[in-house]
Amino acid sequence: MATKFPKFSQALASDPTTRRIWYGIATAHDFESHDGMTEENLYQKIFASHFGHLAIIFLWTSGNLFHVAWQGNFEQWVANPLKTKPLAHAIWDPHFGQAALKAFTRGDTVANISYSGVYHWWYTIGIRNNVELYTGALGLLVLSAVFLLAGWLHIQPKFKPSLSWFKNNESRLNHHLAGLFGVSSLAWTGHLVHVAIPASRGQHVGWDNFIMTPPHPAGLQPFFTGNWSVYAQSPDSMQHVFGTSQGAGTAILTFLGGFHPQTQSLWLTDMAHHHLAIAVIFIVAGHMYRTNFGIGHNLKTILEAHRPPSGRLGKGHIGIYQTLTNSLHFQLGLALASLSVVTSLVAQHMYAMPPYAYMAFDYVTQSALYTHHQYIAGLLIVGAFAHGAIFFIRDYDPEQNQDNVLARMLAHKEAVISHLSWVSLFLGFHTLGLYVHNDVVVAFGNPEKQILIEPIFAQWIQATSGKMLYGFQVLLSSSTSNASVAAQQLWLPGWLEAVNNESNSLFLTIGPGDFLVHHAIALGLHTTTLILVKGALDARGSKLMPDKKDFGYSFPCDGPGRGGTCDISAWDAFYLAMFWMLNTIGWVTFYWHWKHLSLWQGNVAQFNESSTYLMGWLRDYLWLNSSPLINGYNPYGMNSLAVWSWMFLFAHLVWATGFMFLISWRGYWQELIETLAWAHERTPLANLIRWKDKPVALSIVQARLVGLVHFTVGYILTYAAFVIASTAGKFS
């Protein structure tokens, strides 16, 4: 007899209801809970799955390269980057008639326009034709196959790493720091120096000639003689035409600062220098930890030395090394939190300091990339706290952590939670109070009575980095300060030009509207943090439910006996935090997008005047920018925004469907399911189809998850359609 799904749980496989399917899906990746799972097997499974994950990523990127080479217009785009729309791939659809062709593409084939920035990236790194794209696609396909094979190999008995290998922290740190970060940065520097920089100067370097083509006229002599400054001499001039030798220099590692005047992207030679510096730092860092040779740092010793003499941290970090080493959830929480911060930084730097040629002129791509990276950062940070909570429930050992920093954090959790609560309340009432006050006085025709606060501290910080507009005369905004004098011969002239150039996004001028929305965002951040921190710190137990850890991560309720313990599991904290996270990133992206739309349209006054009261946001940002979207198709025909209007509508539908699961209870669904099953069994033809599992309604937690997923997907897709269409409608 065939084994029923799920194979990893005998108890679930023998469940006679549809619960078997849903719980099977829910726990498929919870390896710890699977039948017969050992710690060693757990580590080996996760390790092997990493190779599969990488294989999927390489296959996906290979597909990007392949479809652009096959169906895109990369070579035409390279010839005229500012006037050509980059195509992602063709669309085959019998619904598209002549009218649609004309409306969507203004050409003769239906295609998806690429808003991901890959064209700009490939162009910047030296790719110039479709053959190179095909070569890259093939290379990644081979790499994908290699990683799949490696994943398979590492679950074979002979090649399974041992548990001690996984827990050898020093060795792992050395290899990851020096290998993953250091050597990959060095390799990327090599690519920039040998391929990308020559291509930006009109010299093609490919597989056929890269060994014979020195990237610098002096070759390696300056490197071996210690005369490294030669590599920074004769940089590209301000008149350099990107992709040609006109105005090109010979420098390969520079510190110019600012942007290339024509492409408005960071200087390639600056980026090569940056990656080389990172490579050196990380390769050195990758030799710091003690392994076989008895030299270098020992992590346990370092951690346990962190014990202030004042005694305020109790036993300090004693016990942390063992706790971290033995808890995958602790490690995953730290990794997710770090990755979240990095992803949010990418969102910020991608527009403020564009690294890719001409991307600063592609407003839709900039908007899409910012929104994309901020939402990913939000999802990752919520995941970090979720796994932090699971760590406290499953992996935390009070005996091992007596009076150390972790134990003390748990001991004074009330102080942490109440302070966060106070900050959230303060920010919420004051910010909303200002917005509502301004809204009322504007509505009654007295806009001059608004309370408008200049963000003088933030303006002062901008001035320290060289913004002259505010007249602060401090640090880099004062030509006589030590900071300015020290950097005058290096990167400062280029940087100052960039900071004070009103046409880019670096250090935008800020005023009262920015002050208010920054505090609204701060409210969202602090409230999300409050929910996540409370969920993690109360995961083991609280005054209401001291034995909470015995109920696991995602219990729904424990009945009315203890005063009603609904909505207090660590899972419920994650659930509530997700809504606040989405809300907060909504405000962040609204702010970013509206400020940039007004900047790009040369109408900064619109944002400055309308962003200080609520109706300004609703009317002059949301309504004004969604109206062309809603008119994407109408009785008079369609235009190039029709697809986005359909997506806008459909995503709203997905979002609204979420509420059906969020605002209804199990009994209702159980009755409905039983009625439907009764009708099905008595309907001719339909009753030929039978199922073995008895249909039961989703549990409370499952229904909430289904509702949350619909809410999240609908929310993000609605804004994706809005941000792309409202930007493309103005600048395409």
Swiss-Prot record:
Entries under SUPFAM superfamilies matching the protein = Photosystem I subunits PsaA/PsaB
Which EC number(s) are documented for this chain? Answer: 1.97.1.12
Q: Does the keyword Membrane apply?
A: yes
Give the catalysed reaction(s), semicolon-separated: reduced [plastocyanin] + hnu + oxidized [2Fe-2S]-[ferredoxin] = oxidized [plastocyanin] + reduced [2Fe-2S]-[ferredoxin]
Q: Which GO terms describe its biological process?
A: photosynthesis
Compartments reported by the entry? Plastid, Chloroplast thylakoid membrane
- Listed binding positions for chlorophyll a B1 are H652
One GO CC annotation, please? Answer: photosystem I
Q: How does it sit in the membrane?
A: Multi-pass membrane protein
Q: Which residues bind chlorophyll a B3?
A: M660, Y668
Question: Which Pfam families does UniProt cross-reference here?
Answer: PsaA_PsaB (PF00223)
Q: Name one GO molecular function term.
A: 4 iron, 4 sulfur cluster binding
Cofactor remark from the record? P700 is a chlorophyll a/chlorophyll a' dimer, A0 is one or more chlorophyll a, A1 is one or both phylloquinones and FX is a shared 4Fe-4S iron-sulfur center.
Q: How does it assemble?
A: The PsaA/B heterodimer binds the P700 chlorophyll special pair and subsequent electron acceptors. PSI consists of a core antenna complex that captures photons, and an electron transfer chain that converts photonic excitation into a charge separation. The eukaryotic PSI reaction center is composed of at least 11 subunits.
Stated family:
Belongs to the PsaA/PsaB family.
Tell me what this protein is called.
Answer: Photosystem I P700 chlorophyll a apoprotein A2
Provide the species name. Cyanidioschyzon merolae (strain NIES-3377 / 10D) (Unicellular red alga)
Provide the organism lineage as a comma list. Answer: Eukaryota, Rhodophyta, Bangiophyceae, Cyanidiales, Cyanidiaceae
